[in-house]
Amino acid sequence: MLIVLTGIDGSGKTTAARALVDSARAEGHHALLLSNHAARRRMSLFSERFGWSLPPRGADFVETCIRVVNVLVSHARALRFDGLVVMDRHLYCQLALRRVAGLSRGRLLPWLLEKLPDPDLTVHLDVDPQHAYERVMARGTDHEELADLEAFRSAYRSLPEFGDSIVVDANGTPEDTLAQLNTVIARKEPVRV
């Protein structure tokens, strides 16, 4: 089973992905975590440190290249794995980032989404932007503006692909989110006799 997790920064994607894989392994199942980051955090830290940043199109080009390579490698690994595969982020995330930046969808990402195997579940971790902002600031590894998180949330919801996502409320504890994810997966998995 292939599960893709999406959501704004601070929604708990990575925490939920790790917990889901750890939970499955603890129950004796094969599980694999694949991360499809785009190096946004590293680029923003680099920009802060040296006092310059790429223009939106330049940043998108770099992020898209990194994310596409990661997603393609992840799908290749997922095809060879027998068990639960959890992808932390996907191409949908880049499409939402493009929308926030006022850039078009382009042709490559929609084309890849058509060609790549569909996930069994795409789960969007929905969180109030203020709560996400507090989480981001608490972890202290990067910085986000509240307005950007609000725009990112709206961008996700406006994607045509969003209708295929199952929305999970990620405002609670990581344990609450994991419980909701396990419920969603249980509904999707076929009953084995």
In which residue ranges do the predicted regions lie?
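Hydrophobic anchor at the beta1->P-loop junction of P-loop NTPases
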Residues: 5
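P-loop (Walker A) phosphate-binding loop of NTP-binding proteins
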Residues: 8
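Conserved lysine of the Walker
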Residues: 13
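Hydrophobic positions on the alpha1 helix immediately C-terminal to the Walker A/P-loop
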Residues: 16
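Post-Walker A helix-loop "phosphate-sensing" segment adjacent to the P-loop in P-loop NTPases
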Residues: 22-33
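ATP-dependent small-molecule kinase phosphotransfer cores
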Residues: 32-103, 107
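A glycine- and Lys/Arg-enriched "phosphate-lid" helix/loop adjacent to the NTP-binding pocket
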Residues: 94-157
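NTP-dependent small-molecule kinase module
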Residues: 130-193
